[in-house]
């Protein structure tokens, strides 16, 4: 794998940027960050975080993790609420990785090989620009409420077209790795 230079600077970029947006995720953000930091990878990554003016302890928890992982965690802690769309967009603009993974602050990964598996797939299948995986919806006690939901007419496994992506963007949003179009 090669690591390339970000077009906007002379700094060497990481291989994958993980975008995490938060708003009042105090109960969940530790599990979210731990699930990223547990990844067993042989490439560099960064965590680009955008906290949208949380009124609970989310920002303080993010600062705590950033102090322990200053070379990985790059937070923006807003003093004014801008909404999820702008928050996530601004995070995308800060990404330096060849690939971008997306994880909301109240979600978490359970497989420590998740990023490696998806990156290996994309690196070895150059005709693909994104990949996703199954997910489960859990309650506050991590009890599974619902296994992966695909919806009527949505293929469970297989190749997705741009029409699938546009129609089922939520599923792809919470469980994907995509090649960066920003670099």
Regions found by a protein language model. Name each.
Residues 113-147:
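Conserved donor NDP-sugar-binding/catalytic core segment of glycosyltransferases
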Residues 13-17, 46:
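Cell-envelope/extracellular polymer assembly enzymes that use nucleotide-activated donors
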Residues 18, 93, 133, 147, ...:
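Conserved nucleotide-sugar donor-binding catalytic segment
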């Amino acid at each position: 794998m090669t690591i390339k230079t970000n077009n906007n600077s002379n700094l060497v970029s990481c291989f994958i940027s993980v975008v995490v947006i938060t708003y009042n995720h105090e109960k969940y953000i530790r599990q979210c960050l731990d699930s990223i930091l547990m990844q067993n990878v042989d490439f560099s990554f960064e965590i680009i975080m955008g906290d949208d003016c949380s009124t609970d302890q989310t920002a303080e928890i993010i600062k705590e993790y950033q102090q322990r992982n200053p070379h990985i965690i790059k937070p923006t802690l807003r003093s004014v609420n801008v909404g999820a769309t702008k928050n996530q967009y601004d995070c995308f603009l800060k990404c330096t990785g060849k690939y971008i993974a997306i994880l909301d602050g109240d979600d978490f990964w359970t497989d420590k090989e998740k990023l490696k598996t998806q990156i290996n797939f994309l690196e070895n299948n150059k005709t693909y620009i994104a990949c996703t995986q199954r997910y489960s919806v859990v309650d506050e006690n991590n009890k599974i409420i619902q296994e992966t939901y695909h919806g009527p007419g949505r293929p469970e496994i297989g190749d997705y077209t741009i029409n699938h992506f546009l129609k089922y963007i939520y599923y792809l949003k919470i469980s994907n790795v995509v090649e960066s179009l920003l670099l």
